[in-house]
Amino acid sequence: MHLRITQHLRIMYRSIEDFLSTRKEEESSTVKLFSNLTEETKSVKIHENVRSLERLAWHITQTLTEMGKNAGLFETDLLHELPIPATLPELIETYVNYNTLLMRTVRLKWTDSNLDDLVNMYGEEWKKGKILSVLIAHESHHRSQMTVIMRMLGLPVPGIYGPSKEEWASFGMPPMD
């Protein structure tokens, strides 16, 4: 799965600070989205081939340590095979804690000058700067999936990169089609 997604990703970070700034913004967007989930709908599967909202949220969270371990940032995959946290607040807290750990570890272990270094990832050689880009793109990809499921379940969807349908009214404008 990761290989198909990343084969087309040609962009990469050349600055740790640029990545950390983007990563913090993405964390805010992810927490905003996770905060709109409900305990009543988190485990609903809208189709047998579609993950539940909580499973997608947990996948986003687990990827922080899974990719971090594969990239050499962590000794072990700290969240591997752990169950989904029982409540949404616990899931959000876990996401924030491990995102913070990832950012701190990137800052400590990697430098701008080694972002061109190659790391074996999923049977391919990736530059460290590409790994950072994939972390961002992967999370955005799965958040997008979550917004569709949220709409289908009747949950409000927050704007991430622009206003959502629900937010257009606050601008005094009708929602765009």
Segments predicted by a language model, with ranges:
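Acidic catalytic patch
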Residues: 107-122
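Sequence-level detector for tyrosine residue identity
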Residues: 13, 95-98, 122, 161
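Short, contiguous alpha-helical
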Residues: 9, 20-24, 28-31, 41-81, ...
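Short Lys/Arg-rich basic patches
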Residues: 15-18
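N-terminal amphipathic/basic-hydrophobic helices that include classical n-h-c signal peptides
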Residues: 1-11
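Helix-adjacent hinge/juxtasegments
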Residues: 69, 73-110
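His/Met- and acidic-residue-enriched segments that coordinate or traffic transition-metal cofactors
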Residues: 34-36
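A general structural signal for short secondary-structure boundary/capping elements
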Residues: 105, 113, 166-169
